[in-house]
Amino acid sequence: MSKKSQISNLTVPSVGGLSIYLAQIKKFPMLDAEEEYMLAKNWRENGNLKAAHKLVTSHLRLVAKIAMGYRGYGLPVNELISEGNLGLMQAVKKFDPEKGFRLATYAMWWIKASIQEYVLRSWSLVKMGTTTAQKKLFFNLKKIKNQIAPGQDGDLKDEQVDEISKRLDVESYEVVNMNRRMMGQEKSLNAPIKSGETDEWQDWLVDDSLD
């Protein structure tokens, strides 16, 4: 087994109780640009797992923050974080410090991709379809609905369907179908409480230090 293939075996805190996990990952120091560059160079050129471990642990807070953005899909946040951590490890494995940008910038794509694939699998989008347009709808419909029709349940109005289809460059019927499917799936997944009610999510909030 090559050294780089061992990155998936790096030890990171277990995502059990979320508040405990968040407290644990705060203990890992953030890296300045120079330190990050040297660690990434050492990992890329020498396969130094200690360097890779520092790169991973210093970005666990980033994963947690990104994962919180997907909690509206009714899935356990600890599972979202675990999936995001896998994406982070892939980012570290492929990161080239000579490209001139920071690891966080590069890792965000991998983290989001890993979490999104998990959400798609969990929501059984195989039945809904997994075209580019449908994925775009799935991950943007709720946000746009909250912008143009906050708090509205049920079918969208014609003008709302038109607005969403224009913003996302998809067909109107796709908007209608996805909205109905997501509403039905939310009920089966015991979706989070509605906007304005936060009690059920108190234990899942990231503190301000992640902003």
Enumerate the predicted regions with their spans.
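Short, charge-rich amphipathic segments
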Residues: 1, 157-162, 166
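Alpha-helical promoter-recognition and RNA polymerase-docking modules of transcription initiation factors
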Residues: 2-128, 132-151, 163, 210-211
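Acidic, proline/glycine-rich intrinsically disordered inter-domain spacer in sigma factors
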Residues: 8-12, 146-160, 173, 191, ...
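Conserved alpha/beta core segments of nucleic-acid transaction machinery
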Residues: 123-139, 179-211
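Short, basic interhelical loop/turn and adjoining N-cap
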Residues: 166-177
